Amino acid sequence: MIIKNANIVTLNDTFIGSINFNETILNIDKGNLNNSNAIDFEGDYLLPGFIELHTDNLEKHFIPRPNAIWPNKIAAAIANDNEIISSGITTVFDAILVGNYTKIRTSILDDIITSITRGKDLGLFKADHHLHYRCELSDPELLETLEKYYDNKYIALASLMDHTPGQRQWRNKEKMLEFYGKGSNFTSHGAYDFDEKMLRLEETAKEAEKKNRPKVSTIWREKKIIMASHDDTTEEHVNEASKNGIYISEFPTTLEAVKQAKKLKMKTVLGAPNFIRNKSHSDNVSVNDLVDNNFDLVDIFSSDYVPLSLIQSVFKLLDKGCLLYTSQSPRDTVR
């Protein structure tokens, strides 16, 4: 297959040209191509596929409406794959919640992992899927739950999360109640029923986090699985992650945490939906403000819960004057 008249984006350049491919790229040429059989892009961009490190979009296909769990799990996984690939994402780390703080999401854990595993084994997906375990450290039963799944052959990334009320992302408890409680459209209809005992048993969650963090970190280090620290809020959070051999700060919630992560040479992953919306859904640091402050504060964008936001973020960055590639002068910024 040949595509012509495309604005081709490569590692070090963008140019109008053509590309010939058959499963893999055969050749790329600059300039116009006189071939009536080629697909004419009419100057539209042709970009490499995106790599998505953290998206829980799959869960929406398993629970498309409140309390409505989709019965055909493979079909749900394929529907998610179609959305992922149509958003320009060719490699995806499906972020799967391991640990209990919403009952309905816990109930689909086994089905989600099984569907990704079977879909990969059977070659049903267009994108290349990997498992990313979001380990909820505040769950006293996390280690028992994790034991059933940590030997899956497709696990490639693990993030250490702490959603204890009053900590990290939910340091503002009112925002937590608004998100999971009566103010939530999900909960008001009975789904994503936030387990309010988490608020009543805040101390239990803190104790679980303290016990689980070193043990879970050890498990992943021994299995040579890359880890990310989730929702870092203070310098202490970032320092602790770095001491545990973690090099990724995923969705840091404050400017303080972002700057400390960069100081320790950790990679920062920020939410593309936050960037596109100009604000966080839970009142955390605005990615738009970070980018305006310094492009270098953000290493990686994640589509999180909106797959299409990843490619939209690229063009918003260009509108802000960020270079699409670093080896050219500012006059070559692509808009």
What would you call each of these model-derived segments?
Residues 325-335:
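Single conserved hydrophobic/aromatic residue that forms the stacking wall/gate
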Residues 98-103, 107-232, 304:
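Metal-coordinating catalytic core of metallo-dependent amide/deamination hydrolases
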Residues 131, 226-327:
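Active-site-adjacent C-terminal substructures of enzyme catalytic domains
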Residues 90-91, 156, 247, 299:
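Short acidic/polar active-site loop segments enriched in Thr and Asp
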Residues 1-2, 8-47:
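Histidine-rich, glycine-flanked metal-binding segment
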